[in-house]
Amino acid sequence: MHVLQPAEWSKPRGFSHGVVVDGPGKWIVLAGQTGGNEAGEYQTDMAAQVATALKRIVKLLGEAGAGPEHIVRLTWYLTSKSEYEAAGAGIGAAWKETLGRNFPPSTLLYISGLVDARAKVEIEVTAFVPAK
């Protein structure tokens, strides 16, 4: 996998513009993961919900024999721009703890709500594991 970063472009913070995947391997597509825990309970804090969603993503990737380094795309659905911005430090810490220094192409969308009204974030993932 090769990250696309034209030399004349400024490097984005927290994501990459794109990746190229070349060769055989395994694609993994995860349904959107929200910030609800295994019991379906939600914390009210945006950073805590993002942390839970990211942990769920890492767990599912592990089930597929993959890790954060295999993520090639994230799509975030957020219910509040102000809460997201206020939770920046906590979200950054959660990212570092779960995804490390992996910054795949990402899209963030602000929406009016999610199916479960308690959810503040939902994250979809596409990953690719090269053949060995």
Identify what each model region corresponds to.
Residues 1-72, 78-132:
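N-terminal presequence-like segments and the immediate start of the first folded domain
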